[in-house]
């Protein structure tokens, strides 16, 4: 049985090196791996000994914490219905639908899967150890992220087929077209991130250790850059701003330098995780394997961001959006429908996202030197593809 356990854990640890802010699971034996300190010798007393004090039971560790998520499995968390303008109507010419009427339509963002979600965290880790069995720890550092998804996930919409004889839509016009065949990506800035957690070695038998942990993490990075890759309306915004809690129609100044009532776009990230893992010590190496259950949310207050455009038209245009039918107007130049052939008042919203899968596995190994220093390498699969590095020492 011992040989089988050794083989499974060693294979898991070696496999973790070849595959690749979420939260790491960590080694369940970590509270008892470093039993000596660089400044003070370790104490292995009995907690039931009346002569033992809390000073003998407590020790401190510090080190580097690096967590690198290459693909977090996320989906949107939105309603099934989405309010926007009436769908296009009419076999030819400009649309016959009412441009100022707000209706409920099927939400293309409902249950949509994100194509890519990355998060990179570098932090300092501080751990309070009790009786070489329990760890209470926190991390303080910085994180940055990247998100990419189909434009349907972000409710990218625009106005098309407007028959008004003008260079810009009316103030009460509402987007009537869903632009779902495009890509939206965003980059966040590097911002402060923190996490807290606890880990306990629940059961030990020889060199094997069964442990459990619980962690919570939080960060709120701002959007540094937003890219919309759409043939009908392609644009990039640095440090985007938008409207929170505002329904259609947006102000005609939306997307211009004259816009008011906007706020910086940011992502409020929260995650909590519980895990159970098993390790086996082999001299300097302690491989482990674990299972985890976690829930993460990315909330941007459903902020709506408008395409950048000019306040006043220049050569009768406010954006560089291309024509759809190949001419400036479906109805012809200088007649009704001057702007009907280009996408107008384009905007998108940053929908709330959450974990698509709750369960995952983690495999890794810890290398201990002189019972004072340790380096842990871990990878996580199923609900995310991530790698974790932790280097620490005991005082």
Curated annotation (Swiss-Prot):
Q: Superkingdom of this entry's organism?
A: Bacteria
Species: Chlamydia trachomatis
Tell me its family: Belongs to the chlamydial porin (CP) (TC 1.B.2) family.
**Keywords, in A-Z order:** Cell outer membrane, Cell shape, Disulfide bond, Ion transport, Membrane, Porin, Signal, Transmembrane, Transmembrane beta strand, Transport
Single GO cellular component term: cell outer membrane
Keyword Membrane appears in the UniProt entry = yes
Source lineage = Bacteria, Pseudomonadati, Chlamydiota, Chlamydiia, Chlamydiales
Q: Where in the cell is it found?
A: Cell outer membrane
GO MF entries: porin activity; structural molecule activity
Major place of residence:
membrane
Q: Which residues form the signal peptide?
A: 1-22
**What membrane topology does this protein have?**
Multi-pass membrane protein
Is Ribonucleoprotein included in the keywords of this UniProt record? no
Query: What Gene Ontology biological process does one annotation of this record name?
Result: monoatomic ion transport
Q: What protein does this entry describe?
A: Major outer membrane porin, serovar F
What do we know about how this protein assembles, alone or with others? Part of a disulfide cross-linked outer membrane complex (COMC) composed of the major outer membrane porin (MOMP), the small cysteine-rich protein (OmcA) and the large cysteine-rich periplasmic protein (OmcB).
Question: What does this protein do, in the record's words?
Answer: In elementary bodies (EBs, the infectious stage, which is able to survive outside the host cell) provides the structural integrity of the outer envelope through disulfide cross-links with the small cysteine-rich protein and the large cysteine-rich periplasmic protein. It has been described in publications as the Sarkosyl-insoluble COMC (Chlamydia outer membrane complex), and serves as the functional equivalent of peptidoglycan. Permits diffusion of specific solutes through the outer membrane.
A Pfam family that the UniProt record links to this protein? Chlam_OMP
* Stretches of the chain forming a coiled coil according to its record: none
